[in-house]
UniProtKB/Swiss-Prot annotation:
Entry function: Catalyzes the hydrolysis of UDP-3-O-myristoyl-N-acetylglucosamine to form UDP-3-O-myristoylglucosamine and acetate, the committed step in lipid A biosynthesis.
Cofactor(s) annotated in UniProt: Zn(2+)
This protein's name: UDP-3-O-acyl-N-acetylglucosamine deacetylase
Name of the gene encoding the protein in the UniProt record: lpxC
HAMAP family: LpxC
Family matches, as Gene3D superfamilies: lpxc deacetylase, domain 1, lpxc deacetylase, domain 2
Membership in a protein family: Belongs to the LpxC family.
Length: 305
């Protein structure tokens, strides 16, 4: 039987909030089977929980935010959510003493490191997957995103940036998903932004934690970071990282093929909600026989070592 996963122990780290620029303490705790992914703000009294849920995603301008019925929000969850998807973690409580998850280095890699450091525990309950049965597509102008049936998890993402630092040959990336491919090819790709946009936002009291330490920063001509890019096509790889985190907002790994052109947080979430709203397009599945599970979701030896 393919089992649900959680952490073996509590793990904690500190970082800086992208929006506030203030120190954030992040604590990740093991959780029982069928808990799901719970984000919790402990800076509020009483603490407020935000279960990962596609319908709770309401603000996607600069990041992915979860917003509850009282309009209380928690921001910048997408990179940590991508790390959870990458390692197939089903049950976890994530606490922060701030209104946002720390940005760390702008990628998912620090979260992957923390989760592996905590260790991953298999529970005695079957892991549920969402299997795509019908093609679902959403559009917004010339942007689009699509999910179709596939026995695994495959992603094909294309961006369209007219910028000297982003060569035309590096604007499309394809991935046959697995924990190994996510960790090696996707998790280290950082978020990116224009220096002029960061300066403007900071003048308005926003993006106060934005810096060269947590993003690829470009001007009109080049990448400004001293250490350059981690991958030649780091920009599109990061957009794929965002999509993996956005699609895992349902709390389940998806068995299907995701294809997108110029998609972002809002369109990724629109696709996820469109899939879930069409009952004939998907089904829950479990695997009693490991041999029948798509290889995409087999845990690498490093996860349970």
């Amino acid at each position: 039987m393919i089992k649900q996963r959680t952490l073996k122990r509590i793990v904690q780290a500190t970082g800086v909030g992208l929006h506030t620029g203030k120190k954030v303490t992040l604590t990740m705790r093991p959780a029982p089977a069928n808990t799901g992914v719970i984000y919790r703000r402990t800076d509020l009294n009483p603490p407020v929980d935000f279960p990962a849920d596609a319908k709770s995603v309401r603000d996607t301008m600069l990041c992915t935010c979860l917003v509850n019925e009282d309009d209380v929000r928690i921001s910048t969850v997408e990179h940590l959510n991508a790390a959870l998807a990458g390692l197939g973690i089903d049950n976890i409580v994530i606490e922060v003493d701030a209104p946002e998850i720390p940005i760390m280095d702008g990628s998912a890699a620090p979260f992957v490191f923390l989760l592996l450091d905590a260790g991953i525990e298999e529970l005695r309950t079957a892991k549920k997957f969402i299997r795509i049965k019908e093609t679902v597509r959403v559009e917004d102008g010339d942007k689009w995103a699509e999910m179709r049936p596939y026995n695994g998890f495959k992603l094909d993402f294309t961006i369209d940036f007219n910028h000297p630092a982003i060569d035309a040959s590096t604007q499309r990336y394809k991935l046959d998903f697995s924990a190994e491919s996510f960790m090696s090819q996707i998790s280290r790709a950082r978020t990116f932004g224009f220096m002029r946009d960061i300066e403007y936002l900071q003048s308005k009291g926003l993006c106060l934690g934005g810096s060269f330490d947590c993003a690829i920063v470009v001007d009109d001509y080049r990448v400004l970071n001293d250490d350059g890019l981690r991958f030649e096509d780091e920009f599109v790889r990061h957009k794929m990282l965002d999509a993996i985190g956005d699609l895992f907002m349902c709390g389940y790994n998806i068995i299907g093929e995701f294809t997108a052109f110029k998609s972002g947080h809002a369109l990724n979430n629109k696709l996820l909600q469109a899939v879930l709203a069409k009952e004939s397009a998907w089904e829950f599945v479990t695997f009693e026989d490991e041999a029948k599970m798509p290889v995409a979701f087999k845990a690498p030896s490093t996860v349970f070592a």
